[in-house]
Curated annotation (Swiss-Prot):
It is found in: Mitochondrion inner membrane. GO terms for cellular component: mitochondrial inner membrane; mitochondrion; myelin sheath; nucleoplasm; respiratory chain complex III. GO terms for molecular function: metal ion binding; metalloendopeptidase activity; protein-containing complex binding. Component of the ubiquinol-cytochrome c oxidoreductase (cytochrome b-c1 complex, complex III, CIII), a multisubunit enzyme composed of 11 subunits. The complex is composed of 3 respiratory subunits cytochrome b, cytochrome c1 and Rieske protein UQCRFS1, 2 core protein subunits UQCRC1/QCR1 and UQCRC2/QCR2, and 6 low-molecular weight protein subunits UQCRH/QCR6, UQCRB/QCR7, UQCRQ/QCR8, UQCR10/QCR9, UQCR11/QCR10 and subunit 9, the cleavage product of Rieske protein UQCRFS1. InterPro entries: Metalloenz_LuxS/M16, MPP/UQCRC_Complex, Pept_M16_N, Pept_M16_Zn_BS, Peptidase_M16_C. Keywords: Acetylation, Electron transport, Membrane, Mitochondrion, Mitochondrion inner membrane, Phosphoprotein, Respiratory chain, Transit peptide, Transport. Belongs to the peptidase M16 family. UQCRC2/QCR2 subfamily. It is a peripheral membrane protein. The modification N6-acetyllysine is found at K66, K199, K250. Expressed in neurons and astrocytes of the cerebral cortex and hippocampus (at protein level). This is Cytochrome b-c1 complex subunit 2, mitochondrial.
């Protein structure tokens, strides 16, 4: 997920009515204010509003939109990437300079994040200044101008953004993996293809926003904000584009492999099969399986030697390596498998040892104690992910877009506990028997092909 931060703001919301003043709550007579329960509202136009008044000194508001790269097509690839970088361009209510200078003046922050499914525009700052930040959020998301010369000026930034991201070999592998695993939708890249650099027009940006930034595809989420204020803002200013927008295609899994021979001494390889869509019991089983095999070190600078995958590979290779289970769930599909990093000469033995460990689990070679430990790791990881306001806001927004509702952590933990040992074995069997996808890069002379596993 790419995070881009901008500083900026403006004074009034262009030609529309002034946004309501956000009042800071105060405790009468020194009585401490208690955090409120999460409030959830779905408007008739489909827009979801969720808020939690925690009386924190900082407020955070996020507008989540079903406008990730999966909603692009072959003619407008890279549009969502450029859109992430265009958050501080001139709008109908403020120039680019005014946006940047305004939020900087109040110590605020704008972040734009994106996945293959969604985009999220988030502002945060001192709660007494949330009116300014909220107005800016509304202006950026509902009234962009996308002036041609400003869009053209983003070309160099687009190149740099992609180049920096692709310095990480894992980013390139995950991009290639989705490209080879799917025929459409989820195959679309998070980063603009090179041949599209400088060719995305302001008209394409306007078309994408008009057809995807609609009320029924949005969720407005706030922390440290009154629900009534958030609802009033949504009803007044986020009702400009009705309807469902353009329907996205269902992801079609295909399988295959892509090998990038570049001579690097370290070989990165990911091998996956189609798993399960997010939000169902099977997806929970794959998550438990991921933590059973090893989801990465849980100790800072640790070597993850306690995971089943690491133990298995260590028996078959004396070279340095890193191995973990890979798990990604989307609204209509998912990928599960293994990710290895190894010396080029040892790539074959590392990959085969890791793959054989998953096969062993598929054959029922696991204990109830191991499954319970995996559940505990999964639950701890989930709770820690929603412990911060940033993680909590993201979780609420993602659930609101996916299901139109919110599932509290207690319910999530219950669902994890309900996963049986047999469910984990079944998930492992699905991976072993499923059609595989593979992406690899490095000096691949000793890296096996899919049909050699």
């Amino acid at each position: 997920m790419k995070l881009l931060s901008r500083a900026g703001s403006f004074s009034r919301f262009y030609s529309l009515k002034v946004a309501p003043k956000v009042k800071t709550s105060a405790a009468p007579g020194g009585v401490p204010l208690q955090p409120q329960d999460l409030e959830f509202t779905k408007l008739p136009n489909g827009l979801v509003i969720a808020s939690l008044e925690n009386y924190a000194p900082l407020s955070r508001i996020g507008l989540f939109v079903k406008a990730g790269s999966r909603y692009e097509d072959s003619n407008n690839l890279g549009t969502s990437h450029l859109l992430r970088l265009a958050s501080s361009l001139t709008t109908k209510g403020a120039s680019s300079f005014k946006i940047t200078r305004g939020i900087e003046a109040v110590g605020g922050k704008l972040s734009v994040t994106a996945t293959r499914e969604n985009m999220a525009y988030t502002v945060e700052g001192i709660r007494s200044d949330i009116e300014i930040l909220m107005e800016f959020l509304l202006n950026v998301t509902t009234a962009p101008e996308f002036r041609r010369w400003e869009v053209a000026a983003l070309r160099s930034q687009l190149k740099i953004d992609k180049a920096v991201a692709f310095q990480n070999s894992q980013t390139r592998i995950i991009e290639n993996l989705h490209d080879v695993a799917y025929k459409n939708a989820l195959a679309n890249p998070l980063y603009c293809p090179d041949y599209r650099m400088g060719k995305i027009t302001s008209e394409e940006l306007h078309y994408f926003v008009q057809n995807h930034f609609t009320s029924a595809r949005m969720a407005l989420v706030g922390l440290g904000v009154s629900h009534s204020v958030l609802k009033q803002v949504a009803e007044q200013f986020l009702n400009m584009r009705g309807g469902l927008g353009l329907a996205g295609a269902k992801a079609k899994y295909r399988g295959g492999e892509i090998r990038e021979q570049n001579g690097d001494n370290l070989v990165h390889a990911a091998i996956v099969a189609e798993s399960a869509a997010i939000g169902n019991a099977e997806a929970n089983a794959f998550s438990v399986l991921q933590h059973l095999l090893g989801a990465g070190p849980h100790i800072k600078r640790g070597n993850n030697t306690t995971s089943l995958l690491s133990q298995s590979v260590a028996k078959g290779s004396h070279q340095p390596f890193d191995v973990s289970a890979f798990n990604a769930s989307y609204s209509d599909s998912g990928l599960f498998g293994i990710y290895t990093i190894s010396q080029a000469a040892a790539a074959g033995e590392v990959i085969n040892a890791a793959y054989n460990q998953v096969k062993a689990v598929a054959q029922g070679n696991l204990s109830s104690a191991d499954v319970q430990a995996a559940k505990n790791k999964l639950k701890a990881g989930y709770l820690m992910s929603v412990e911060t306001s940033e993680g909590f806001l993201s979780e609420i927004g993602s659930q609101a877009l996916a299901a139109g509702s919110y599932m509290p952590p207690s319910t999530v933990l219950q669902q994890i506990d309900s996963v049986a040992d047999a469910d984990v074995v079944k998930a492992a069997k699905k991976f072993v028997s499923g059609k595989k996808s593979m992406a690899a890069s490095g000096n691949l002379g000793h890296t096996p092909f899919l049909d050699e596993l």
